[in-house]
Amino acid sequence: MISLEVSLRHLAWSNQKVFTYFSAAPEEVFGLTAAEGEWPVGRLLTHLAGSSQWYRYCLNGTLWTDLKPIVNAEVAAEYLPIMTDLDQVLLDNVALADEELTIDADGEIIKATRSLILSQAVVHAAEHKGQIATILKQHGHHLDLDELDVWAFIAETQSDA
């Protein structure tokens, strides 16, 4: 059975692929939306990093920072090391005990297991990558999700699932 560790390694690999793709993308794509009033691609990319900061906070208490909005390829490229660091926090937590964590969310106390937070990180990123790919396709651009899937990850990294 595929492990949470493999899923998180795939997430980290996929994040690097996505942010590399956008580090060479034309500026117009960062403002594209699925519909009026929906988040543009750049905001969704920034949200991926912001969410990872939230997971890091939930796991180890490190507060998040204000992230520079991704509005062009240059800013997207700046996120490559940020995503590497944030993904490493997730990977560092996979070997720890699956204990219940207490999270202070602006005064509201939330209880969640470590595995729940790590699983949510994987699923959440996949959902938004699908959303981003759909927005791009709507506007004549292409982000090939098959090149980002777990099969491609295993083939490229020659890892055992």
Please report, for each region that a protein language model flagged, where it lies by residue:
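Active-site rim elements
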Residues: 1-7, 76-77
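Short, contiguous alpha-helical
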Residues: 5-69, 106-161
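Helix-adjacent hinge/juxtasegments
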Residues: 57, 61-99
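Mid-chain, well-packed structural core segment of small domains
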Residues: 90, 96-105, 110-114
